[in-house]
UniProtKB/Swiss-Prot annotation:
UniProt keyword annotation of Lipoprotein present: no
Residues annotated with Phosphoserine modification: 32
Transmembrane feature ranges: none
Main location: secreted
Domain of life of the organism encoding this protein: Eukaryota
Cited PANTHER family: AMELOGENIN, X ISOFORM, AMELOGENIN, Y ISOFORM
Post-translational modification note: Phosphorylated by FAM20C in vitro.
Region annotation (Disordered) ranges: 96-213
Localization per Swiss-Prot or TrEMBL: Secreted, Extracellular space, Extracellular matrix
Protein name: Amelogenin, X isoform
A GO molecular function held by the record: structural constituent of tooth enamel
Source species: Bos taurus
Homology family: Belongs to the amelogenin family.
Gene name of this polypeptide: AMELX
Amino acid sequence: MGTWILFACLLGAAFSMPLPPHPGHPGYINFSYEVLTPLKWYQSMIRHPYPSYGYEPMGGWLHHQIIPVVSQQTPQNHALQPHHHIPMVPAQQPVVPQQPMMPVPGQHSMTPTQHHQPNLPLPAQQPFQPQSIQPQPHQPLQPHQPLQPMQPMQPLQPLQPLQPQPPVHPIQPLPPQPPLPPIFPMQPLPPMLPDLPLEAWPATDKTKREEVD
C-alpha cells in the first residue's frame, strides 16, 4: 500500500508543479489541455479531408458535374453494341428494363434496336406470343363479369347526391353572410377608444398637483 500511496503522491506533485514557460501552453498541467487538445488534433487530422471537399450540398454539385461524363460514356456503349451482336441476343430477354435507359441520350439508341429486333429476336417473340394469347381470353372474362353489375350501380348512386349537392353549396355560404355584420358592432373596440384618453388625464392631474405643492 505504501508504494501505491507514494506513486499517487508523486503523480499529484507532478500535476501540481508549474512548468517552464512555453508559447501556447498555460504553464501548468491541465487535463483539458494536455488530453483533449491531442484528441482534437487527432480528430482534425482524421476528419480533415471531409471539410476540404465541402459539406453535403457541395457533394451534390459534384455529382451533377459527373452526370455529363456518364452521358459521354453512353455513346461509347452504343459503339460497342454493334461489335457484340451475338452475345447480346440472349441477354435481350431479361434486359428489358435497359430499354428505357437507352433512349435517354438520344434517338440513336432506337435505330440499332429496330435493326436488332427484326434480325435476331424473332425466336424470342415466338414464346411470348402464346403466353400473351392465353391470358387474353381469361382476363376479359373476369373483368366483364364484375364490370356489368358495377356500371349500373355507379351512375345511380352518384347521380342522386350530385343533384342536391349543387343547390346545397350555394345555400351554405348565404347564412354565414348575415351573421357577419352583427359580429362587428358586438366587438368592444368603440368603448375602448374613449377609455384611452381617460387614462391620460391622471398624468396631467399629477403635474398639476406637483405645481400646487
